[in-house]
């Protein structure tokens, strides 16, 4: 832009330079991703390659069909208009290209962009919700202790205070050991302490209702990972997020369905402004379409 200002508007080519300057001003706000580069970045050429076209540019996503087959298939079907929705008001069945025209309704800059919320879709959520497809052992959660050697709580659990620790860790442990009353605490103290020191993150998440599988691999959530949002175990619908940074504290609780292979710059642009999911924001980025291109 500074270079452009050096040109005099008295040139006969004034219109050209003004148009070029306008292009340079606007172009940083859009991102351009390349199909050839996207294909080259794929881990497996047989995986589905999706093109997400947004108001900020293109994002190419390699879906990991071998790691989350059911959830990947549902995502493709939603994108391609293969899932039926019954509208009680219209008394009719529709098969919309679900994501077309939706927005990234939740944005936490430098952390995550989230889209596909059924709360913002006139037809709501597809039924049924799908089960998680997560291999906690592949993630190493069976080897991560809840308590470190100095007695501090594993930071990936994001436990904020003693009350939360009691609710999330101690109460389910008591139930597993059959401790139901205060009077039973003292006789069971040794068992409680032993089990507490041996408690893993995987086991704690199982207390919370997560069920893990070992018949396929699972990768952790890192920058560029595409995973399904949920409101609890085995509650996977259409809503998804793209991680803008490594986020290992999310591992084991969200089913990973893909990875961005081209267009992370676009994702960063979308993530440049915080968006509150509780209210519509006309400045939020639009998903024009999501299509399989291979």
Predicted regions mapped to residue ranges:
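Cyclophilin-like peptidyl-prolyl cis-trans isomerases
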Residues: 30-294
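Short, low-structural-confidence N-terminal segments
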Residues: 5, 16-17, 31-33
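N-terminal secretory signal peptides that target proteins for export/translocation
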Residues: 1-12
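Bacterial N-terminal signal peptides
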Residues: 15-27
């Amino acid at each position: 832009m500074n270079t452009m200002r050096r040109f005099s508007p008295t040139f006969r080519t004034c219109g050209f330079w003004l148009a070029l300057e306008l292009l340079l001003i606007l172009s940083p706000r859009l991102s351009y991703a390349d199909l050839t580069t996207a294909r080259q970045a794929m881990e497996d050429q047989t995986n589905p390659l999706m093109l997400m076209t947004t108001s900020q540019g293109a994002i190419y996503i390699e879906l990991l069909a071998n790691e989350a087959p059911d959830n990947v298939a549902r995502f493709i079907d939603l994108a391609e208009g293969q899932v039926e929705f019954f509208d009680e008001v219209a008394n009719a069945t529709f098969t919309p290209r679900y994501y077309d025209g939706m927005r990234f309704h939740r944005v936490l800059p430098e952390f995550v962009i989230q889209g596909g919320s059924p709360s913002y879709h006139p037809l709501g959520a597809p039924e049924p919700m799908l089960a998680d497809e997560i291999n906690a052992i592949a993630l190493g959660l069976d080897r991560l202790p809840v308590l470190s050697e100095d007695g501090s709580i594993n930071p990936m659990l994001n436990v904020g205070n003693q009350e939360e620790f009691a609710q999330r860790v101690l109460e389910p442990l008591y139930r597993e050991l059959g401790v139901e009353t205060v009077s039973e605490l003292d006789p069971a103290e040794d068992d409680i302490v032993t089990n507490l020191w041996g408690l893993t993150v995987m086991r704690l998440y199982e207390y919370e209702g997560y069920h893990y599988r070992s018949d396929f691999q699972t990768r952790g959530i890192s920058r560029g990972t595409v995973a399904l949002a949920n409101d609890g175990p085995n509650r996977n619908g259409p809503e998804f997020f793209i991680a803008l940074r490594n986020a290992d504290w999310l591992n084991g609780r969200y089913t990973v369905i893909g990875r961005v292979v081209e267009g992370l710059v676009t994702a960063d642009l979308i993530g440049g402004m915080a968006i509150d999911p509780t209210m519509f924001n006309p400045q939020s980025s639009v998903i024009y379409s999501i299509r399989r291109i291979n």
